[in-house]
């Protein structure tokens, strides 16, 4: 049923074995996200751009990216080396791990190849690094909490078999330091 002055829409044929049932992905994304003249993206028709972005999604500087990549590479190499030391790999696994270590440490290997290799070996290695970091932080917090010196209450002091009494200030210690004599051992 076409409106007057407009041509009728074409209907898609019934989906066959090789035809997708939903619209083309490109046309779907065009309808979901439109660009304004100044280049800011507008989603769902609202004309406002988000004022604050998530700090994790903010682009990092070149130095920060290089530092993060170095940490990721070091983590992956460390995991591979630990796997070689702690497990009993087959010769094929050992050769594969050594080749991966060599590739990750190489200065000639391009960065996309290193990232691809890390993802193929470890899956989502960034999430694993983050989880490991959180576990280490939690362990440090619990260790710091258990290491704190807590004052002993009055009830605990009363239970103790040791009697703690303040010394009178007039008495001196068992060894007297008042003599000015030179110290000598009495071996003879």
From Swiss-Prot:
Region (Disordered): 1-65, 87-112, 144-182
Keywords, alphabetical: Acetylation, Phosphoprotein
Coiled-coil spans in chain: none
Ranges annotated as biased composition (Basic and acidic residues): 166-182
Modification Phosphoserine occurs at: 41
InterPro entries linked: DUF4615 (IPR029274)
Pfam families cross-referenced by the UniProt entry: DUF4615
Entry-annotated residues carrying N-acetylalanine: 2
PANTHER family: UPF0488 PROTEIN C8ORF33
Family according to the record: Belongs to the UPF0488 family.
Protein name per UniProt: UPF0488 protein C8orf33 homolog
